[in-house]
């Protein structure tokens, strides 16, 4: 595999290989979609790293996993790389199901250092001599979990090597004090000039790097005078850098020198997000996760959120918007442009975002916390303890709910209904269309008197923002019977309703806009007229909307057949949305088969 070949290559050959990999990644991602900018920035870093460390022996952990395409290419997946993010193909993230060289499955930011500590202690207890290397971005480093683990390194005598991939970005530009500190480290001209002169002098001596280490007090004094305390060194870690993340020869020398150090080290590497692809370099946020290039421009629910909140906030000065390093991903960059003083990007800090929103709400504001469904679960304690327990008026805009497609199991938003349903005071709204979405937002914000969650999909659609917003109005947040039939009743929540409406059977169809509370009046009417009720949700079936409906029907003493349709007890793989819905039996064809099964069973038995 390429992993062996790169160790024999000259630096000129490595540079050519880097350009070949850059070309391959660009071509495949522009076709399949994927994380382009972050991967173009880590090619040289990965090549240098794998010249020194071997993932077959050493635990190399890629935080978040969205910058590991070169890792995949080098570790035996070069021939399959064209399948990345396609149904049945390679995952867009690091996963142990795909390769034993993917030491730890990732997809959410900030987990790598804690995982590295776990591997390191396992190796130690088992008497295995292996290195542990973590590659983490400066954006992920701001997450609470990463900082918690960083704080433990010295305490448990770790020897971990942390490669800080600093490109000044997560998805949106990084914010906060740590981002400012890293900026100072990589840009201080006096320090960089002084360090360069000192290093040149030392390298001319016979004992070179060893002298530099012995004269560490001089280097530290230089840094201290210019920059103040180094954050990493204040935690008892050794800090090296910053280094050019695109200089393979330099990085290889650095990695060789620190490989066998017996103390925890941070190697600060500065890279260019989108390196080598001009469009991605100029707009790394746009190309962080690039859609297939041939996909026509459509409007997303995320963008619609931004436009809707901006419009409502013109009249309601109490509305504020909060996100966790996802200004563009959640559509809130649209709100930010019009209302910058009421927009807050707190970095990769979902827990902080929720509690921050709770306090805003408790003092008279109307906070909208916009976070992807898969990331909101990281702040569950704060949702329960800080928001719901105090009945704080917070609107959770749960983006990317349901099946998200190519990003796969780490990003599907299939658990939000299940983890929010049992929370007291929480209301859950699941619109079925863009028009219902904007009117639901308008209605909720007109009378936000407690915690409300509105969930909506990753899907895009054809539509004009202005025409949708012109029809925004206050609506009844209840259920509606859209059509009546005799064979069975189907209660669907969310945009999966559109698949239900395609079922060519004589069935009643109910649009359940509210997941919680249930619309008991409509439910009683349906129960009176039907002996088969089928619930459909694009979420986990166990403990979901259907279970909630079944419980209520049982309490009502209803004697019919209740069928809950949703995602079974499994982690859904990656692939196109249509392919996944078909596989899960949640497209119109699969739903039709399910409904027919129960209708036919009743006919055969003369009962349900």
Swiss-Prot record:
The coenzyme or cofactor needed here is:
Mg(2+); thiamine diphosphate
Question: What are the recorded GO MF terms, alphabetically?
Answer: 1-deoxy-D-xylulose-5-phosphate synthase activity; magnesium ion binding; thiamine pyrophosphate binding
From what superkingdom does this record's organism come? Bacteria
Q: Quote the cofactor binding remark.
A: Binds 1 Mg(2+) ion per subunit.
Q: Report if keyword Repeat is assigned.
A: no
HAMAP family assigned to the protein according to its UniProt record, in alphabetical order: DXP_synth
Q: Which family does the UniProt entry place this protein in?
A: Belongs to the transketolase family. DXPS subfamily.
The name this protein goes by in its record: 1-deoxy-D-xylulose-5-phosphate synthase
Organism the protein comes from: Thermotoga petrophila (strain ATCC BAA-488 / DSM 13995 / JCM 10881 / RKU-1)
């Amino acid at each position: 595999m390429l992993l062996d070949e790169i160790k024999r290559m000259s630096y000129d050959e490595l540079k050519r290989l880097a350009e070949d990999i850059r070309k391959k990644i660009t071509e495949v991602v522009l076709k399949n979609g994927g994380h382009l900018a972050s991967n173009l920035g880590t090619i040289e870093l990965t090549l240098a790293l794998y010249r020194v460390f071997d993932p077959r022996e050493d635990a190399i952990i890629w935080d978040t996993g969205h910058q590991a395409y070169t890792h995949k290419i080098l570790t035996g997946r070069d021939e399959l790389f064209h399948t990345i993010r396609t149904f049945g193909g390679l995952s867009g993230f690091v996963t142990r199901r795909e390769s034993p060289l993917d030491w730890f499955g990732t997809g959410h930011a900030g987990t790598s250092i804690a995982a590295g500590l776990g591997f390191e202690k396992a190796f130690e207890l088992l008497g295995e001599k292996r290195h542990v290397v973590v590659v983490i971005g400066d954006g992920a480093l701001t997450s609470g979990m990463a900082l918690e683990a960083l704080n433990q390194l010295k305490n448990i005598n770790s020897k971990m090597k942390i490669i800080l991939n600093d490109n000044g970005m997560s998805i949106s530009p990084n914010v906060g004090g740590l981002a400012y500190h890293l900026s100072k480290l990589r840009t201080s001209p006096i320090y960089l000039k002084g360090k360069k002169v000192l290093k040149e002098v030392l390298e001319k001596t016979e004992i070179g790097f060893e002298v530099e280490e012995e004269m560490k007090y001089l280097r530290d004094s230089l840094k201290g005078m210019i920059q103040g305390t180094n954050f990493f060194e204040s935690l008892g870690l050794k800090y090296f850098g910053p280094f050019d993340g695109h200089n393979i020869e330099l990085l290889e020398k650095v990695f060789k020198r620190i490989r066998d150090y017996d103390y925890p080290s941070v190697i600060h590497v500065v890279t260019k997000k989108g390196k080598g692809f001009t469009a991605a370099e100029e707009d790394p946020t746009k190309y962080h996760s690039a859609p297939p290039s041939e996909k026509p421009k459509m409007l997303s629910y995320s963008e619609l959120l931004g436009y809707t909140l901006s419009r409502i906030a013109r009249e309601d000065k109490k509305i504020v918007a909060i996100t966790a390093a996802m200004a563009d991903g959640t559509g809130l960059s649209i709100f930010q442009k019009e209302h910058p003083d009421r927009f807050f990007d707190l970095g990769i800090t979902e827990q902080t975002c929720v509690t921050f929103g709770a306090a805003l709400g408790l003092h008279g504001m109307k906070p909208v916390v916009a976070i992807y469904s898969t990331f909101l679960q990281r702040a569950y304690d704060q949702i329960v303890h800080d928001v719901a327990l105090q009945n704080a008026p917070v609107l959770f805009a749960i983006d990317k709910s349901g099946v998200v497609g190519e990003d796969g199991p780490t990003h599907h938003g299939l658990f939000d209904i299940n983890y929010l349903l049992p929370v007291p005071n929480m209301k859950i709204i699941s619109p079925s269309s863009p028009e219902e979405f904007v009117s639901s937002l308008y209605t909720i914000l007109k009378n936000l008197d407690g915690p409300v969650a509105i969930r909506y999909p990753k899907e895009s659609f054809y539509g004009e923002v202005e025409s949708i917003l012109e029809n925004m109005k206050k609506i009844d947040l209840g259920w509606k019977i859209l059509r009546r039939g005799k064979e069975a009743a189907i209660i669907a929540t969310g945009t999966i309703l559109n698949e239900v409406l395609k079922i060519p059977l004589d069935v009643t169809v109910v649009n359940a806009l509210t997941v919680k509370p249930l619309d008991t009046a409509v439910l009683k009417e349906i129960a009176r007229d039907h002996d088969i009720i089928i619930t459909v949700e694009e979420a986990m079936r166990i403990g979901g909307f259907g279970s909630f409906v079944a419980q209520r029907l049982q309490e009502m003493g209803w004697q019919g057949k209740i069928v809950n349709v949703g995602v079974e007890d499994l982690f859904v793989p990656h692939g196109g949305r249509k392919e996944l819905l078909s596989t899960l039996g949640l497209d119109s064809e699969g739903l039709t088969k399910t409904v027919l099964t129960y209708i036919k069973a009743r006919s055969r038995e003369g009962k349900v």
